[in-house]
Amino acid sequence: MLGLNHTSVSEFILVGFSAFPHLQLMLFLLFLLMYLFTLLGNLLIMVTVWSERSLHTPMYLFLCTLSVSEILYTVAIIPRMLADLLSTQRSIAFLACASQIFFSFSFGFTHSFLLTVMGYDRYVAICHPLRYNVLMSPRGCACLVGCSWAGGSVMGMVVTSAIFQLTFCGSHEIQHFLCHVPPLLKLACGNNVPAVAPGVGLVCITALLGCFLFILLSYAFIVADILKIPSAEGRNKAFSTCASHLTVVVVHYGFASVIYLKPKGPQSLEGDTLMGITYTVLTPFLSPIIFSLRNKELKVAMKKTSFTKLFPQNC
């Protein structure tokens, strides 16, 4: 489907966790707990949104879709990572490596696009409240969600097809704990590598920066409108609807900038592994915590839903 270039390399060896030989069991237990918490946290958000009629609004529809993208992103990466921590054979087949890159980039960029859509939703709600029902109609929301998923899939296809059209020769050890673009490019050879490497980086950075700048622009208008509210209580109430989203944006793009905008130069295997862990494990882990703690309406609804499921006879 992606026109992959099957070279003499039939598999790769993931060596990222070899930098921490004495910590692998502890890391396995830690990442397993974080993985389960991420899944359960996002599932609880989804169940709460769908079971509480008061949350059937565009903002919570987007949040529910964001939870789906986070679940799929973690499922695409972490189970394989957990298996490698318990194994001495950390080989990954050529096609499995391509699939991991495709799904991780697809769901990762879908997450970024959905955060952008949520920023636009907050902009419309605060700056154009009288037109909110028109601009954020069910059809319009479905279109925004569909475009986010389609955009993520296109990004995944572009990156995967560009990388796996290259020829891989020499060493087949990936200096990472998952199939990741920069260490894969170091294994590629051929005349087209100098063009593909900056091209892929430019596409990814442009997409991320475009989303980030759109969110910044949305919040610039939001802050300007909030400052016009005369009462402090009104300003706090308006800003509270944005606090959880803004916090997740800072976490998401903060960790993403570490991965994609780090300066060129010699990098240690330990440093690359730790930076990768922050983005692939820690970011999805923090997201449901932030939304459940900083969104008062969602927090109350989650408590109600949890109580109903645990003690149905008392409801």
Each predicted region: which residue ranges?
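Transmembrane helical core of 7TM receptor-like proteins
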Residues: 1-315
